[in-house]
A protein has these predicted regions:
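Low-acidity, Ser/Thr- and Arg-rich intrinsically disordered low-complexity segments
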Residues: 3, 9-23
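Short, Lys/Arg-enriched N-terminal segments with co-localized hydrophobic residues
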Residues: 22-33
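Local sequence-structure signature of Cys/Sec-based thiol-disulfide redox active-site neighborhoods
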Residues: 35-56
Length: 257
């Protein structure tokens, strides 16, 4: 089950050897807009590990003068050529499709209300998806891509209910494809979410950090400094282990703090 959870945040290409150099025309910076943020954080709202890492990043923001540009990577788009029935456990097609629909709304929110709206929307989405037990009858991840699920979340985020119209707007998918390709051009194509770029637009980027629980306020900054230290070394590429605990989130059965 845990392997299936982790696969949910990955591209199916992650089972293959690393692809090496980026494809021509999609190198770092080719599609990036100018940003003065300290990091670019690429997320899909249905990935539990991206949510845990984003919560950690927000704790760091609260203790330091630290800016984040919340950007998009769609698990459904980066797996668009994949046979979901063979590559993923049952139900992940619906879940990833819901993530794509929610990212359309995030893209519309950014276009109309700016980056702060994306930050507020992602915070509200993650809290609704992961920080409370799953509602009976809503175990199907596809429910998260519906107006019934989204409209109360928009209200909690202080955003107009009309943004829910973007759920169906496939015209936004080109923007999401470009930004997903931008993220993978920074790391290689054998990863998933989250992807973090330090000191954009020219700084190094990595898939992760993948952690299974949110650090405490006291742990957040020292742990982050360790990650930044690794990222500062130009030869650093990967630090990984396959053994991990389930995400410590209420949606996965963890007790409330």
């Amino acid at each position: 089950v845990l392997t299936a959870i982790m696969v949910a945040c990955m591209t199916a290409m992650s089972v293959r050897p690393p692809s090496g150099a980026s494809s021509p025309g999609t190198g770092p910076g080719d599609n990036q807009s100018m940003s003065d943020a300290d990091i670019h954080f690429y997320f899909d709202p249905v990935c539990p590990f991206a949510w845990i890492t984003s919560t950690w990043v927000r704790k760091v923001q609260a203790q330091r003068d630290y800016t984040v540009d919340w950007r998009f990577i769609s698990l459904r788009i980066i797996n668009s050529a994949v046979d979901y029935d063979r590559a993923f456990p049952a139900g992940y097609d619906a879940g990833h499709t819901a993530g794509l629909r929610l990212l359309r709304v995030a893209a519309r929110a950014r276009a109309q209300h700016g980056g702060d709206a994306v930050a507020a929307l992602y915070a509200a989405l993650g809290a609704a998806i992961f920080d409370q037990p799953n509602e009976p009858g809503h175990a199907d991840g596809g429910y998260r891509g519906t107006r019934a699920f989204l409209e109360p979340i928009l209200a909690r985020a202080g955003l107009p209910a009309g943004l829910a119209d973007a759920l169906e707007d496939t015209g936004l998918d080109d923007e999401l494809r470009r930004e997903s390709a931008e993220a993978l051009a920074l790391t290689g194509k054998d990863v998933g979410t989250p992807i973090i770029q330090f000191r954009p637009p020219d700084g190094v980027a990595f898939f992760g950090p993948v952690i299974s629980r949110v650090p405490t306020d006291e742990e957040a900054v020292p742990l982050w400094d360790n990650v930044v230290g690794l990222a500062a070394f130009p030869g650093f590429a990967e630090l990984k282990r396959s053994l991990r605990e389930r995400p410590q989130l209420r949606s996965f059965g963890a007790a409330a703090d």
